[in-house]
Amino acid sequence: MTQKHRQPEVNIGLVGHVDHGKTTLVESLSGEWTDQHSEEMKRGISIRLGYADATFRECPELDEPDRYTVEETCPDGSESEHLRTVSFVDAPGHETLMATMLSGAAIMDGAVLVIAANEPVPRAQTEEHLMALDIIGIDNIVIAQNKIDLVDREQALDNYEAIEEFVDGTVAEDAPVVPISAQQDVNMDLLMQTIESEIPTPDRDPDADARLQVARSFDINRPGTTWEDLTGGVLGGSLTQGQLEADDDIEIKPGREIEEGGQSEYQPVETTVRSLQAGGEFVDTVTPGGLLGVGTGLDPSLTKGDALAGQVAGPPGSLPPTRESFTMDVELLDRVVGEDAEEIEPISTGEPLMLTVGTATTVGSVTSARDDECEVQLKRPVCAPDGSKIAINRRVGARWRLIGVGTLR
């Protein structure tokens, strides 16, 4: 008897331009649709990070790539063998939602960059997402050239050459390009084979203190639930180190905002892990990899509507400091990513920046700027260790655009 549900051991981001087929690709591999927010259904684009797990299996008697499958039964009727379960993070491809994409990148071990074969390369968001992977240092990348069913052979080859030219000199320059049709299920076995070889499960230290990067938080109680039947708030995110068990005590930082005498400050929140969910199953222990649901004893009003997204949880006393301001070393890009591609001016004192640190996105005001470093005062504090990478966005026209990367000092 095979174990059908296993905890995912690696997080793979799906990135690329809106409507290039990322969500269809997840559905093809996992049978799940990641757009589970009502607003997303209406607009047809992933707004918050969508998650879905897929179990890769193989039929050992078949040749590559035919041996790779997500089915439990091989063509000859025998049972397929479990390779590993992966968690896909479907990052939004919508321009104004770049911050969500960047917060998702903080929990990705590798990425599949989805590029449509029937559109010019690169589209603005494709370029911006690739830049984000570069900034955060994700270099295990596979490129899926999707929608090949909509073009002829010559168009597909021209598009392939455009992709190769586009990724030249970037973190994805050696990434394999796999032609697929997620809609028609073409070459999905080859894509799985390529993911297996290019995006390995990272080595992790099982003895480190648990650290959960919170990317979502929910109140799962239905309206009208009586207080006796209320379920505590739920955190969704990724364990980046250590392990977490039911009944563990955890601290969440920066925590909740407390207002006193017209001043507000953030205070860490402590609670107990009531339940753990991984790979769609309730489990007693979770290890790094995949996306988890952590049921807590928190008042659900604290967690509803992603109120704790961007926070960090772990054993009390083990977390990095909460920072209301910090100094960072800055490396600016040569130009703003996007259609207008204008040059980037140096950061100046007084300007607002949108900063993504781990899964947290906050706005900071620059209090001091020198050549390659600046100090910022944050609107909402973050919990982050020294050396953290920070994506820096500046207001360009009506949008926040990625302009560089900072390293927390």
Curated annotation (Swiss-Prot):
Q: Does Transmembrane helix appear among the keywords?
A: no
A Gene Ontology biological process in which this protein takes part is: formation of translation preinitiation complex
CC annotations in GO: cytosol
Q: What is this protein called?
A: Translation initiation factor 2 subunit gamma
Q: Name one GO molecular function term.
A: tRNA binding
Q: Say which enzyme class the record assigns.
A: hydrolase
Q: What cofactor does this chain's UniProt record say it requires? A: Mg(2+)
Which stretches does the entry tag as region G3? 90-93
Region (G1): which ranges? Answer: 16-23
Q: What does this protein do?
A: eIF-2 functions in the early steps of protein synthesis by forming a ternary complex with GTP and initiator tRNA.
| Subunit structure of this chain's protein | Heterotrimer composed of an alpha, a beta and a gamma chain.
One of the Pfam families matching this protein, by short name: GTP_EFTU
Spans annotated as G5 = 181-183
Q: What's the family?
A: Belongs to the TRAFAC class translation factor GTPase superfamily. Classic translation factor GTPase family. EIF2G subfamily.
Region called G2, residue ranges: 44-48
Query: Which residues does the annotation say bind Mg(2+) 1?
Result: T23, S46
On whether Nucleotide-binding is a keyword of this UniProt record, the answer is: yes
Annotated region (G4) at 146-149
Q: Which organism is it from?
A: Natronomonas pharaonis (strain ATCC 35678 / DSM 2160 / CIP 103997 / JCM 8858 / NBRC 14720 / NCIMB 2260 / Gabara) (Halobacterium pharaonis)
Q: Which Enzyme Commission number(s) are listed?
A: 3.6.5.3
User: What keywords does the record list, in alphabetical order?
Assistant: GTP-binding, Hydrolase, Initiation factor, Magnesium, Metal-binding, Nucleotide-binding, Protein biosynthesis
Q: Where does Mg(2+) 2 bind?
A: D19, G44
